[in-house]
Design a protein with these regions (language model features):
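Glycine-rich beta-strand-centered segment in the early N-terminal region that forms part
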Residues: 21-38, 48-90
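Short glycine-centered segments of the SAM/dcSAM-binding site in methyltransferase folds
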Residues: 82, 140, 164, 230-231, ...
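Mid-domain Rossmann-like dinucleotide-binding core that forms the NAD(H)/NADP(H) cofactor-binding site
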Residues: 116-192
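Glycine-rich phosphate-binding loop and adjacent beta-alpha segment
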Residues: 169, 217-288, 322
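C-terminal hydrophobic helical "lid"/dimerization subdomain
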Residues: 270-322
Length: 322
């Protein structure tokens, strides 16, 4: 089968398309013939070695397709089932092996590309808004990278929960998308200081929560945006990792809360995984949640997909097709 492999860490140029054997499922596993692959920032972290993996490895952590083989002792999944998955290595390929308990059934009215676009970022938006900091009516939230795949989903879910949403974006075109998703206010951080704008928009009160996937370049000001006992939810680091800092700053700035959540810990039990995924799929099918697939590339052009994602030339989701 064809797979995009990494033999050494580096830029997009290290991605190589190779022929490797089709894997066989072991006990408790299923093999999925992949129809669509989600591209995520975690793929870039792994490619560059920020999140180191033993080389060589097949990149990718998200996809959707059809079960075409199962190993012994598999229940609840059968050959022919349409399924999605997230946080499973080896997705930039034609086939992937997945523990059967980590597969999510895809409803008939959700196509494979939409499922691949929703599994990681949709479930992330769900747990961030329902569990990490459970948004409620009257809350005011700041969402960085508001026109990205996760950002657009976060806006929509936050509005469903009754929150006032402020988004940050880099261009007028991205501001339009964030507004269309439901953001109450959009700040162009390339033209204005987002901290100063937040203070104006909240009459100096500050925010209940900041959802920050950017990291290094936004971290300090994100903390300064918060009200006393506010929450900074740091769920990514697209601008680089946050340098070490003194936790005493959290007390000095208002007894703030800082958390660095991971999808894996918010879907530990299969029941929780299914609940979150089913909510996302049901909202999408009902038209309450719209997923934006911005660009689609053949798997052979994975490097170009990475260049565009890193270069902030995308909005919504980027998909690869095997």
């Amino acid at each position: 089968m064809r797979a995009v492999r990494v033999h050494k860490y580096g830029g997009p140029e290290v991605l190589t398309l190779e022929e490797i054997p089709v894997p066989e499922p072991k006990a408790g596993e299923a093999r999925v013939k992949i129809e669509a692959i989600g591209v995520n920032y975690i793929d870039i972290y792994q490619r560059t070695g920020l999140y180191p993996l033993k080389t060589p490895f097949t990149l990718g952590t998200e996809g959707a397709g059809i079960v075409d083989a199962v190993g012994p002792d598999v229940t609840g999944v059968k050959i022919g089932d349409r399924v999605g998955y997230a946080m499973i290595p080896g997705s930039y390929a034609e086939y992937v092996i997945v523990p059967a308990t980590r597969l999510v059934p895809i409803p008939p009215n959700i196509e494979a590309r939409s499922a691949a676009a929703l599994m990681l970022q949709g479930i992330t938006a769900h747990y961030l808004t329902h569990s990490t900091y459970a948004l409620k009516k009257g809350d005011t939230a700041l969402i960085h990278a508001a026109a990205g795949g996760a950002g657009l989903l976060l806006i929509q879910i936050a509005k469903q929960l009754g929150a006032t949403v402020i988004g940050t974006v880099s261009t007028e075109a991205k501001a339009k998308l964030a507004k269309e998703a439901g953001a109450d206010h959009v700040i162009l951080y390339t033209q204005a200081d987002f901290l100063a704008e937040v203070k104006k928009l909240t009459d100096g009160r500050g925010l209940d929560v900041v959802y920050d996937s950017v990291g290094q370049t936004t971290f300090d000001k994100s903390l300064d945006c918060l009200r006393p006992r506010g929450y900074l939810v740091l769920f990514g680091q697209s601008s680089g990792p946050v340098p070490p800092f003194d936790p005493g700053k959290l007390a000095a700035k208002g007894s703030l809360f800082l958390t660095r959540p991971s999808l894996a810990h918010y879907t530990l039990e299969r029941a929780e995984l299914l609940q979150r995924a089913n909510d996302i799929f049901n909202w999408t099918a009902a038209g309450k949640l719209k997923v934006r697939i911005d660009k689609t590339f053949p798997i052979a052009e994975a490097a170009e997909a990475h260049r565009q994602l890193e270069g902030r030339k995308t909005t919504g989701k980027v998909i690869l097709l095997p």
